[in-house]
Amino acid sequence: MEVGSIREKIIVALLIYRFGEANVETEIPITEPEVDVKSFGHPISIKTITGKGLAGVKLIWTVDAQKAKEFCENYYPKCDMLLVQVNWNDTGGFYYIPLNVQKRVFDKLSRKNYIRLPRPGTNPRGVEFTKEALSNLVGDSESRNILINWQRTKIEFNPYKRWVDLWRKD
């Protein structure tokens, strides 16, 4: 879960850089469903995926089968979405999917073909968009994208060193 939160923070930092701190609201409760940030007062959901294909993007993270079922029964898109596909050493993208596109695709495909529930007895960690839904969302003429060539660079980093050094000072 922390990996997702860190990825979201990187995207939010990009919004702050581009639009200014005054126009990006970051104090959104973690319990707020779907909304990760507000830009110019508009709620935005941030989704990230790593890999070549647009599959496995979570609508909600949960291992509780009942909670997943309830979410599926009650879900309807409620905010714009930023979808970031990281495809290391290859091309991925940064997609903006407006709320009206999500609603249109949801209504066209139906709940059953938009949402993929976890299979009983597995531990997939959440409810996902179907591949068909994602394909329709990113392919819509009103959605926008920036293709990104993701190059992984080697960074020597020890996350414990800073703290060990600080403890040594005391």
Positions of the model-derived regions?
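Nucleic-acid endonuclease domains
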Residues: 1-34, 38-170
